[in-house]
Amino acid sequence: MGTNPLLANALDLDRWADTLESRGAFPELMRRLLAQTPGVTNIDIRAHEGIAASGWDGTATSDGSSFLPKGELRFEFGTNKDPQAKANKDYNTRAKKVTGKSDEIFVFVTPRNWLNGASWAKKRRQEGVFASVEAYDVHRLEGWLQSTPAVHYWISEQIGKPVSGAQTLTSWWEQLRRNCKIEVPPEFHTAGRHNESERLMQLLSRDGTVSALQAAWCNDALAFCHAVLLQADDAKLERALVVSEPEAWRYLAMQGSRLIMIPVFDNPDIGLALNERRQCHRV
């Protein structure tokens, strides 16, 4: 199955870069992408209010993947209309602080279309200041998002795309909260359910298992899942998707990025999602 045409594409992200919100949210997008890319550790990225602090915009260690080189990665981000001007400014600032040759990899990332990004990076690599220099523009990000569907759904929701068939568990919770006359905190749904909460987390840590919840109504079960993950494991919460249509289920089950898939329709193909030849998702 191909990519979902309703999810954010390169043009959507380029337009989003014009918004004030993107300045603080783009680093969060990068943090989520890195967190869901296998072989990436030591992630430290400032987002939202933290972007004004000095130092690198982000750091991480990579074992190497389809989208990242192997090594110590040092990130600079820019949502500016002129990505090359921002990249030059950031590169020059960092290069001045290098004594000898750095063993770090300089990575500039922009949600803009940057036609000359590859040639810019090649020229900078030839200077030999850093171990390597990379430049990622919106088209590289689009491909990366397609391989990390939980992040793809999240950013699509953030920029207002009318996604269907699935949504992040966090988005589902926010919709429920807005529709309630009385605001109920997430922890309300785990009150008196300590053993059940621990049991759910245990099941989600095992390969090839299906977590079955029984509740008086579907929303209660989903709210319980959200509250447990919110309290126990943000990383798992960011991978959790509520799937409402069989087509979306099949699409997500075929993806290589590990997900927590929560079906809210009848007779989902559980075996497809648990297929270890691709990626054993959690259900």
What does each model-found stretch correspond to?
Residues A215-D220, L230-V283:
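Conserved P-loop NTPase "ATPase switch" module shared by AAA+ and STAND
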Residues M1-C218, Q255, C280-H281:
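Mixed-charge (Asp/Glu-Lys/Arg
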Residues A227:
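Active-site signature of alpha/beta-hydrolase-fold catalytic machinery across serine-
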Residues A223-F224:
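Hydrophobic positions on the alpha1 helix immediately C-terminal to the Walker A/P-loop
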